[in-house]
């Protein structure tokens, strides 16, 4: 996925996808442990719910990406996981939500949203 890292484009990708993870690398080739864990947690839960995919955006693809994302989301770390248009946090928070069962509830809600 390639774009100009404007607030409008960041908002658009979040609005158009039920699940988005902004990460270092890709789910298949993560470039940091936190991004790998975040993608793995989201992938496990999505698979369990029969969802085929989620959107991922590689913040290493452009030198402007990390600062633009952090400024837009007002969240200091990468990865950043968005579900149903809302920032839920990074990999630690995604893992906590997975372990508590709350992630399943979040993904089950409004299952007809854009995927």
Language-model segments: which ranges?
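Beta-strand cores of modular interaction/reader domains in eukaryotic scaffold and signaling proteins
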Residues: 20-22, 55-56, 82
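Flexible, polar/low-complexity N-terminal or interdomain linker segments that lie immediately upstream
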Residues: 1-11
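Thiol/disulfide oxidoreductase modules built on the thioredoxin-like
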Residues: 70-77
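Local sequence-structure signature of Cys/Sec-based thiol-disulfide redox active-site neighborhoods
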Residues: 10-51
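Thiol-based oxidoreductase modules, predominantly thioredoxin-like and allied folds used
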Residues: 25, 48-66
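Non-catalytic, surface beta->alpha helical segment in thiol-disulfide oxidoreductase systems
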Residues: 83-115
């Amino acid at each position: 996925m390639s774009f100009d890292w404007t607030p409008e484009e960041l908002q658009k990708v979040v609005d158009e996808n039920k699940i988005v993870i902004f990460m270092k690398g890709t789910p298949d080739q993560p470039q940091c442990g936190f991004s790998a864990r975040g993608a793995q947690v989201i992938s496990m839960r999505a698979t369990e719910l029969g969802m085929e995919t989620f959107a991922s955006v590689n913040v290493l693809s452009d030198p402007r990406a990390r600062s633009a994302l952090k400024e837009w989301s007002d969240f200091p770390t990468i990865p950043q996981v968005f579900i149903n248009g809302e920032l839920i946090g990074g990999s630690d928070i995604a893992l906590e939500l997975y372990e508590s069962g709350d992630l399943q509830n979040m993904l089950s809600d409004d299952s007809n949203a854009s995927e």
